[in-house]
């Protein structure tokens, strides 16, 4: 009855108005699982390949009809007849069918869409929510959100070099309380920016994108908004950054064009250390470029004892890249993006490897999202303890927060909010 009888993909639009892949998997008893694939703007060089058509006459070359055809053709032919509960075997079959190291033939967007839709169908077939089906009875930890309230870098049309300025409500009693705290700070920040004559337009991930160039000015606005909302920075709510440093790493230097600075690797470490000394920052993502291993080691040696140093472009949710980072002593946390590696099985393998090495995990969205809230379930399933899914605006972001609220309600008394347990040092 849990046999796959049909797999169908279609081209839909993501939150940036770009095409992406959506997949339906239908089982013999009529159960159907559906998944939509996200897409990133600042992408790591080592990510699995997202297949785009390149036909400039459609969607400026960003169409995904070839990936859709791969699902409806080769992949469907391979997987129809499989038992949907055999996730590992199904993912392995698709990886073998693709035959490349980076899923470049069929496309990671094709493979991932099927992988997640299969998991959803199997969860429904077994009458379990997705977080329980994937995570088992131990899945009960609700993650602390990293709420991106000021956008810069590749996510906004402004001169801010650092890509994301985030708040983390560690003092919340539960996820519902955390969302409320974040929303209150978000709305307070809007008033502060407006009062300063700055734009309150939002970026790709729902955060504000004001026309300011200084990292410290952005941080000051966030601190002031936390305080005016009635909370204490560094006690109730902490700060987190996503530098996306690979985006401004040019010819061996870190070029902060918004601030008019060009820094060596060591100087960039000093720059970040000074921010940590002056602000209640507990997490920095991609503080160094993806190939600057020496810089990552220096940053980890300098700040790793007290700050979570998250590898996104560095690790790309890839067990091989993560293993190298662990061996080199670089970073102490991994950002988890299912589309970077391209299958649920490989994602879970990377998460487990990070856990075993005492690295933390942060479940993450992409800047190009849909209403699909799968990552909320996966955050709980893997007991990540942290989730990064944008600001308190745009329904593509709020879909994940709302799903976490539902999951917490369903878990009842066994639900645990990670809260202060994520703090280091």
Curated annotation (Swiss-Prot):
Keyword line: Cytoplasm, Glycolysis, Lyase, Magnesium, Metal-binding, Secreted
Active site: 205, 337
Pathway field: Carbohydrate degradation; glycolysis; pyruvate from D-glyceraldehyde 3-phosphate: step 4/5
Ligand binding (Mg(2+)): 242, 285, 312
Cofactor(s) demanded: Mg(2+)
Annotated catalysed reactions: (2R)-2-phosphoglycerate = phosphoenolpyruvate + H2O
EC number: 4.2.1.11
Pfam families referenced in this protein's UniProt entry, alphabetically: Enolase_C (PF00113), Enolase_N (PF03952)
Cofactor note: Binds a second Mg(2+) ion via substrate during catalysis.
Alphabetized PROSITE patterns for the sequence: ENOLASE
Residues annotated as binding (2R)-2-phosphoglycerate: 163, 337, 366-367, 388
InterPro entries linked to this entry: Enolase, Enolase-like_C_sf, Enolase-like_N, Enolase_C, Enolase_CS, Enolase_N
GO molecular-function terms, A-Z: magnesium ion binding; phosphopyruvate hydratase activity
Any Gene Ontology CC annotation: extracellular region
GO BP field: glycolytic process
Coiled coil ranges: none
Gene3D superfamilies: Enolase-like C-terminal domain, Enolase-like, N-terminal domain
Compartments (UniProt record): Cytoplasm; Secreted; Cell surface
Family: Belongs to the enolase family.
Known role: Catalyzes the reversible conversion of 2-phosphoglycerate (2-PG) into phosphoenolpyruvate (PEP). It is essential for the degradation of carbohydrates via glycolysis.
Record protein name field: Enolase
Organism of provenance: Ruegeria pomeroyi (strain ATCC 700808 / DSM 15171 / DSS-3)
Lineage of the species this protein comes from: Bacteria, Pseudomonadati, Pseudomonadota, Alphaproteobacteria, Rhodobacterales
